Amino acid sequence: MKQIDFDHGTVIGNILGAALPMLVAQILSLLYNIVDRIYIARIPSVGTTALGAVGLCFPIIVIITAFSNLFGSGGAPLFSINRGKGNIKKAEAIMNTSFSMLCICGVALMVIGMLFASPILVLFGASEEGLSYAYPYMMIYLIGTVPSMIATGMNPFINAQGYATSGMLSVTIGAVANLILDPLFIFGLNLGIKGAAIATIISQTLSAAYVFYFLRKKAELKVRVLSKGEWKACRDDAKNIVSLGSAGFIMQLTNSLVTICCNSVLSGIGGDVYISVMTIVSSVRQMVETPIYAINEGTSPILSYNYGAQRPKKVKKAICVLTCMILIYTAIAWSVIIFEPEFLIGIFSTDSELLADCVEALKLYFAAFIFMDLQYVGQTVFKSLNKKKQAIFFSLLRKVFIVVPLTYLFPYAFHMGTKGVFLAEPISNVIGGSLCFITMLVMLKRSI
């Protein structure tokens, strides 16, 4: 199995070698998420309502993903840093601790989610009609919580060992399965929105099975569940994993919080149709962020490994490459969103009323999206170099202290209606992104 040489390869070569397979994997993953929504939106008679119902489930799905990344993205940089130092036993212990915590947390989230799914969805803004579609979708989705968390949380450990192609394959397996199963279950078996959920959990289970098989049988460092007697010895590892992973965890939880707040305000001001508008806007954002995520995650192990190996020049060069790649890509993506929004919206729905409302919302929401690049770069660097405090602070700043208050302030205090909800995002991009990037530059000057 081909492995990236972190010691002797060039910085640009290593980043591209890690990022390109991940980009392919993420595009396929995006496709199966997006295709899910495209098919759901085209269910006869109830498509728009069903699409909004799936949007109501997003916060719960994001919370599950956040816990996956708490242990996966928290453990993988520490794993890479210790590999860079040559401390292989420590690296292996970190991976096994992450895996064990993922499994335990997955079971707990599944049980809690199933017990409280209905009141949670109502709290998130579900109407009586919306709940009739969101509840069955969510209950089925929750069955696959553990496989979903293993597939998402353990894949970074495949990439961290330099097996970028295998990391890509793990995502590809689930994506292809979902692309095949979605139309079969939704339309062929006439299961509607329930069919979409069933297709998703089968696909996630296939991905998880491959990830576990590879890390158990093929990878250089092998994964296993910690024995009862090992937990005490790995307590410090668990604390460090959670501490570093808290930044990404908080960032995703705050994304979920923002979605909840937006849905709540939009439902009260604009009705269920604006829940569907927000679902489409969020879907476009997911499309745009996919290559950015691949570049970030492809760069992260290179940053961590060279930081652990005490090669500051390579660390700085990797940051420069990361920044340039993301800025160039985002400039192109932003131009498409601003000048051809109808094309992107049309991917998800042909509803004329929805299209008219979405165009303005999309342009407002993405007005200053280029400034988000600064946040992406800063957060990736903080996480990769084990700078926990900065990573956590900037995860909270943009969403909790800027977006959430403005989401309520603009529509109600300034009487801006639904426009105010979408305007909160670009303002937070400018303030949060700029402060995060400046802090990263100061940190690099002082400590590297």
What are these regions (language model features)?
Residues N69-G72, Y141-N159, G167-N178, A196-V211, ...:
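Short runs within selected transmembrane alpha-helices of multi-pass transporters and secretion channels
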Residues G17-D36, I140, G174, S203-S207, ...:
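Transmembrane helical elements of multi-pass membrane transporters/channels
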